Design a protein with these regions (language model features):
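A cross-family phosphate/adenosyl-ligand binding-site feature
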Residues: 1-119, 125-402
């Protein structure tokens, strides 16, 4: 994530979830953003301003009339400088103030003066959140252009269980990144991505699978989301959901095949990063297979060739990207697969190369199309995903010029 040159104003209000916000401030500052933190006085009861000052290297402002802080009309200069405001956690009280234009502290004053994108993450007791007054106030904020980040559900600090939890740090950071990090050059595109390994059952207890974690597919989904695409992620992974992305679960190759047919054929791009089984048990035992002396033989049968089917039925607008996991003859085998299955691009990687393959956060790949072969050095899967998105965008642009 690269937010260099961006100014972000974080508004922290008086809820217990304020303790989570140092992680968000640190992540944004680490990404290069100039982070300024505004706190309500009640917020300082939960966490001290010094924490944010240490993490951001900027003065944390609480009092609108702080005479020890030299700033050119602070609320105006901060409002003008901000590329984005994130108010999290946002209490029912502050949400009500903002919805009705009240500006009685530095946070609400800067928010009222700012013209940048504004994100609000409600965090409160379930009954307070579901109160019609709070819901009307949130709708009012949306009417005025605020983006309301949906609350999570679970055990709350008050002991109740329900909605009202502040979303995880990564979700808040993704909302910021979607607004600021990239040109929205995939706006209007529908992209379908598959991720994770298939699980082919042998009996009610066991199944055949592989080492795929889904990290590469999730990185591609996130990259396309950040660039403005409408993304559907077909997944067997238990990784956290990607914000703004439609999640469609699958387990077996047959379920993935049906999900591809249902979601991908009217898309602009299909990126098949899932590790799909080539074989499955021909018969699934109705009861657990018991251990006994001697060998156990399981008859296998071929699964459907999903990419092969897509290649045969591919509509003109659909860009198809597959993955090739090899241990030798990487380029030759991957290029042959590209042509055989009528793909537009194949991402080839050798699982024997250190830092590549399953379960790690990095990859070493070669992007192969009909006209070029680009070898990428060891880098994060997020960076690889951006390179894949680059090829999708460039291919679409070339087609539009014809």
């Amino acid at each position: 994530m690269n937010l260099k040159g961006k100014t972000i104003v974080l508004g922290i209000t008086g809820g217990i979830a304020a303790y989570k916000m140092p992680n968000v401030a640190h992540a944004l500052a680490k990404a290069g953003a100039n982070v300024h933190v505004l706190m309500t006085k009640n917020a300082t009861e939960f966490i001290t301003p010094l924490v944010f000052e240490t993490l951001t290297n900027n003065r944390c402002i609480v009092d609108t009339f702080d005479r020890n802080f030299q700033y050119d009309v602070a609320h105006v200069s901060l409002a003008n400088a901000a590329d984005l405001m994130l108010i999290a956690p946002a209490t029912a009280n502050v949400i009500a103030k903002l919805a009705h234009g009240l500006a009685d502290d530095m946070l609400t004053t800067v928010t009222l003066a700012a013209r940048c994108p504004k994100l609000v993450a409600p965090a409160m007791n379930t009954h307070m959140l579901e109160n019609p007054i709070t819901q009307d106030n949130l709708k009012t904020l949306e009417h005025y252009g605020f983006t309301v980040i949906p609350s999570g559900s679970g055990l709350l600090a008050c002991g109740d269980t329900g909605s009202g939890r502040l979303p995880d740090d990564g979700v808040l950071v993704d909302y910021v990144a979607r607004e600021l990090e990239h040109e929205k050059d995939m706006q209007g595109m529908k992209v379908v991505v598959s991720a994770g390994g298939t699980r082919e059952p042998m009996d009610p207890v066991r199944y055949l699978t592989n080492h795929s974690t889904g990290k590469m597919g999730y990185a591609v989904a996130r990259a396309c989301m950040l660039r403005g695409a409408d993304v559907t992620l077909l997944t067997s992974s238990d990784l956290p959901p990607v914000p703004f992305v439609k999640m469609v679960p699958f387990a077996t190759a047959a379920e993935l095949f049906e999900a591809v047919k249902a979601n991908a054929m009217d898309a602009d791009a299909l990126v098949m990063a899932a590790a799909v089984a080539d074989y499955r048990p021909a018969q699934v035992a109705q009861d657990k297979i018991k251990k006994h002396d001697g060998e156990l033989s399981i008859e296998l049968e071929r699964t459907d060739d999903i990419l092969g089917w897509v290649g045969e039925h591919k509509p003109e607008q659909l860009f198809v990207c597959g993955f090739s996991m090899e241990t030798k003859d990487l380029i030759e085998n991957s290029t042959a697969k590209l042509h055989k299955k009528n793909m537009d691009m194949i991402v080839a990687n050798n699982v024997k190369v250190p830092g590549a393959g399953f379960g790690v956060d990095t990859n070493v790949v070669t992007l192969i199309t009909e006209s070029i072969s680009t070898a990428l050095p060891l880098q994060s899967k997020d960076d690889v995903a951006m390179h894949i998105a680059d090829v999708i965008v460039e291919t679409k642009r070339r087609k539009q010029k014809k």
